[in-house]
Structure formats: C-alpha cells, structure tokens
Amino acid sequence: MKSAASSSSSSAGSNWKALKKTLGSDASSSSASSSTNNRRKLSTSESTKPKRTRLDAKEKDAEGSKSCSPAPTSLPWFAEDISPQDLELVRESASGKMARSGEWEGIVDAKLKKQIILGGLPSDASSAKKEPGNYLAIDCEMVGVGDKGSESILARVSIVNFHGATIYDQFVRPQEKVTDYRTWVSGVRPKDLKGAPSFSQVQGEVANLIKGKVLVGHAIQNDLKALLLSHPKVLIRDTATFQPLRDLAKTKYPSLKKLAKLVLGIDIQLEGESHSSVEDARATMAVFRSQKPKWDEMLRSQNKGGRGSLARLASRSSAANKVWKAPANGQAVDAASPALDKRSMLAFTSASAVHDTVRLKPRMAAKADWWKESM
C-alpha cells in the first residue's frame, strides 16, 4: 500500500515536470514566433516605405519655408479681425454696388446729368413746379446792330422759374437793322426774328411777369438795360456779383460758364455750340439755388429791420417796376442812370432799396457786353 502511494506520487511529480516543460517550450515558441512576427511586420513596413530621394528633401525644405511665412490673404490689415459673417456681408454689398454701377454705366451721360441739374426730367415735373412762383431767372440774347455789328440789341428773352421750368421764351423783332446775328454765340438766326413780336410787346409782357418777383440773373443789369426796364434792388439776386461766388471763382467778374463748372459740375456754352438763353437762365437759377440759404442769411444780416421790414420794402417797391417810354422828341430824359453803375446791385439799404425807372437811350441800353471783356 505504501509502495503504491509512493509510486503514484512519483508519477504525479513526473507528470507535472513534463507539463511544465511543455508549457515552457510553448511559451518560448510563442514568444519566438511573436518576435519573429514583429520582425516580419517591421521589415514589411520598412520595405513599404518609399525611399527618400534628394527631390523629396528639397520639397520638404520648401514646405518648411512655406509654413514659416504667413498665409497669403486678400484682406487689408485692418480687416483681418473681422468675423467671416461680417466679411461675407461686406462682399455681398460690394458686389451689389458693382452690379448696380454696371447697370448705370453708359446711361447717365453728361447731357442727361446737365438736364437733371438744370431742370430735371420732364416726366418728373409736376404741375406745381411749372408755375411761375416767387423766383424767376432771366437771360437775354443779343444781336449786333450799327457799323459792323459793334452794338448790341435785344433778340431773345428767356425766363425760368425756381425749378428751371420755362415760363417765358420769346424772340424779339429788332428795332434796328441787324448787321451781325452772332449766331455762333447767340444761337439767333434770321428766320427766328421774322414774324417775332415787337420790342414794346415783349417788354410789356416781361414787365408784368417779373413784377413783385425775386429776379435772378447773371450780370442782370445787362438784361434790364436791354429791356429798358427797372426792378427793385431788394428783389434782385445777381450771381455775377455775389461775393461768395466771386471768392470761389477767384475773380471779380466770374462768368456763368465758370460758375456752372465750379458750383454745378456741368459744362455749358461749349465751344462750337451756340448759346441758349433758356439754358443760361436755368444754369443761373441752379447756381442761385445752391447759394440761396447763404444768400438769405447775408441779406437778413444786412437788413437790420429783419424779415418783416424786407417784406414791406418788397411790397412797396413792386410798383417801381415800370416800362420806360421814349419822349415825343425821341431824346432821352436822363442819360445818367443807376443801371450804368457797374457796382454790385446786391448792396442795398432802406434808402436805396427802391429806385426809379431806368431812363436810357436805346443805344446806350444796348451796350451791355462790358462784363464779357473781364472774363
């Protein structure tokens, strides 16, 4: 019995030793196979990697230099911290403006711009804007009479309202033989004067139209002398003598053409084109409109009595707008007249706001080109 137990224990011990050896050999073989597999994987991965060439090295250097330099951007420095949403809005707005400008390109030309500034489009003119109103601008065209057309006489009168709408436009039948129509500058042709109303008729119509109105003109004393009319100084606005416009043009006698360019940004009286008294009257009124607030303020400061006193002067002086009629003997009653004074007709006082009727010989009144010599 004892020998049987010992034999079984020795058998068990030998079995454990045999199993241990088997497990050890399996572990060593598995570790060996694992290391072998690892070496195989490593060799396989190394074999699959592309061999580095000199070109790859150069490309890597180039990439490194690119990564060091800042990324290129089309935005200015002050816009780099703007959010992408805001930038997108800006881009959309800019593209919209470019599209709209593209639509208008070639449509708004110089002629259309001039038309809009001087009187607006005919389709935009309401019936109220076609009424005479309280402000009228006047311009006259002359033709030459006498020896070689050296003297001027009235040939056309144009009057526009505050908005530039034509209120009156009439050719005048000359009182004397025309020796120079000056078509290149006046736009007047012989056919325009045939059948035109007489001077006295036009004179009376203009006198009735401007009575009690604020009369705007450029060197307006020339137009009044050509018409042989007077008008109260308190109701006159002369763009040729308004000091701020003189300062702007840097000359004592600025031409209407120069003021239109400086103030309105348009070209009038272009070379090769005949003048139009309607266009000149509209340009004069447009210049006046741009200066009206400043003009009114200057007049109020000059008139210490205030707006009420100015209105009373205007109402009293409206009766002074008279038509001169030559005496029976054909001689001028008074050759000396305030209208011949080349000083500004804007400077007025309570004593000089109302003046008498201008009395001039027709030939003297026709000499109305002195201001052109100073341009």
From Swiss-Prot:
Sorted alphabetically, which keywords does the UniProt record give? Exonuclease, Hydrolase, Nuclease, Nucleus, rRNA processing
Q: What is its EC number?
A: 3.1.-.-
Name its cellular compartments.
Answer: Nucleus
Q: Which CDD domains match?
A: REX4_like
| GO MF assignments | 3'-5' exonuclease activity; exonuclease activity; nucleic acid binding
Does Transcription show up as a keyword for this record? Answer: no
Q: Which region ranges are annotated with the description Disordered? A: 21-78
**Any one Gene Ontology cellular component term annotated for this protein:** nucleus
- Does the UniProt entry include the keyword Nucleus? yes
What positions does the domain Exonuclease occupy?
Answer: 134-297
Q: Where is the composition biased (Basic and acidic residues)?
A: 53-64
- Reading the lineage from the top rank, the first entry is Eukaryota
Q: List the disulfide bonds.
A: none
- Ranges in a coiled coil: none
Q: List where Low complexity composition bias occurs.
A: 25-35
One GO BP on record is:
RNA processing
Q: Which PANTHER family match?
A: RNA EXONUCLEASE 4, RNA EXONUCLEASE REXO1 / RECO3 FAMILY MEMBER-RELATED
Main function: Exoribonuclease involved in ribosome biosynthesis. Involved in the processing of ITS1, the internal transcribed spacer localized between the 18S and 5.8S rRNAs.
Give the family per the record.
Belongs to the REXO4 family.
Q: What is the protein named?
A: RNA exonuclease 4
